[in-house]
Amino acid sequence: MAGPSLACCLLGLLALTSACYIQNCPLGGKRAAPDLDVRKCLPCGPGGKGRCFGPNICCAEELGCFVGTAEALRCQEENYLPSPCQSGQKACGSGGRCAVLGLCCSPDGCHADPACDAEATFSQR
């Protein structure tokens, strides 16, 4: 009697779990795998040295950020591309990424953020 009950309980627990098994589990677990569909945002600014951080925001490490200027016009092309993009490597603020030293940018704008210290780098490196 205890054998079938134990087997049913184990099968029930197995059905309810969604664990990674040894063959297919990435290092760090299921959610640790990087999103492979994200590409680098378009280059922008003088000499293409910057990257788009929003439809009107272009940031270049050496030059700072251009918001709503002619240097950022190319960034509007991102609205017409089918795949998402990401600039900057370090997350900051509410859905933003570190753009230049001390500055966090999201598609809505940029603001000063202490999380964007000297380690904030561009993904183009």
Swiss-Prot record:
Location(s), subcellular: Secreted
Molecular function as annotated in GO: neurohypophyseal hormone activity; neuropeptide hormone activity; oxytocin receptor binding; V1A vasopressin receptor binding
Keyword Secreted attributed: yes
Predominant cellular place of this UniProt entry's protein: secreted
One of the protein's GO biological processes = response to progesterone
Q: Which residues carry this modification: Glycine amide?
A: 28
Signal sequence segment: 1-19
Disulfide pairings:
20-25, 41-85, 44-58, 52-75, 59-65, 92-104, 98-116, 105-110
Gene Ontology CC, one term: secretory granule
User: What UniProt keywords are attached to this protein's entry?
Assistant: Amidation, Cleavage on pair of basic residues, Disulfide bond, Hormone, Pharmaceutical, Secreted, Signal
Q: Which domain of life is it from?
A: Eukaryota
Pfam families the UniProt entry points to: Hormone_4, Hormone_5
User: What family does the database annotate?
Assistant: Belongs to the vasopressin/oxytocin family.
What function is annotated for this protein? Answer: Neurophysin 1 specifically binds oxytocin.
- Subunit details: Interacts with oxytocin receptor (Ki=1.5 nM). Interacts with vasopressin V1aR/AVPR1A (Ki=37 nM), V1bR/AVPR1B (Ki=222 nM) and V2R/AVPR2 receptors (Ki=823 nM).
Protein's name in the database: Oxytocin-neurophysin 1
Upper lineage = Eukaryota, Metazoa, Chordata, Craniata, Vertebrata
By which gene is this protein encoded? OXT
